[in-house]
Amino acid sequence: MTFTKSVDQTTILQGDRSKLKDLLRLRLNACGWSDQVRLLCREAIKEQDSINCDALVQQVTPKARALIPDTVKKELLQKIKTILVQQEGIDI
């Protein structure tokens, strides 16, 4: 089993996955990331009038991921580590 699958299963079983997603959404909105991604989408649509949704996502995703602040990434990773440590403590 890969580390990613283990994290997914643990967070789903504990009900923490939705909490993590909510935290991520909150932090990304607070730092203006959502607005930046919205602007990237608008620019891509202006450049290519007939772009479909899949192509838009494919074009914008790498840029959007690069715009995520390191502080948000670090906070989320710390929360995941905390959840995994707590889970390990419960299993012992």
Curated annotation (Swiss-Prot):
Cellular component, GO annotation: DUBm complex; nuclear pore; nucleoplasm; SAGA complex; transcription export complex 2
Keyword tags: Activator, Chromatin regulator, mRNA transport, Nucleus, Protein transport, Transcription, Transcription regulation, Translocation, Transport
Biological processes per GO annotation: chromatin organization; mRNA export from nucleus; protein transport; transcription elongation by RNA polymerase II
Subcellular compartments: Nucleus, Nucleoplasm
Molecular function, one GO term: transcription coactivator activity
Function: Involved in mRNA export coupled transcription activation by association with both the TREX-2 and the SAGA complexes. The transcription regulatory histone acetylation (HAT) complex SAGA is a multiprotein complex that activates transcription by remodeling chromatin and mediating histone acetylation and deubiquitination. Within the SAGA complex, participates in a subcomplex that specifically deubiquitinates histones. The SAGA complex is recruited to specific gene promoters by activators, where it is required for transcription.
Quaternary structure (record): Component of the nuclear pore complex (NPC)-associated TREX-2 complex (transcription and export complex 2). Component of the SAGA transcription coactivator-HAT complex. Within the SAGA complex, participates in a subcomplex of SAGA called the DUB module (deubiquitination module).
Family under the similarity heading: Belongs to the ENY2 family.
Entry protein name: Enhancer of yellow 2 transcription factor
Gene that specifies this protein: e(y)2
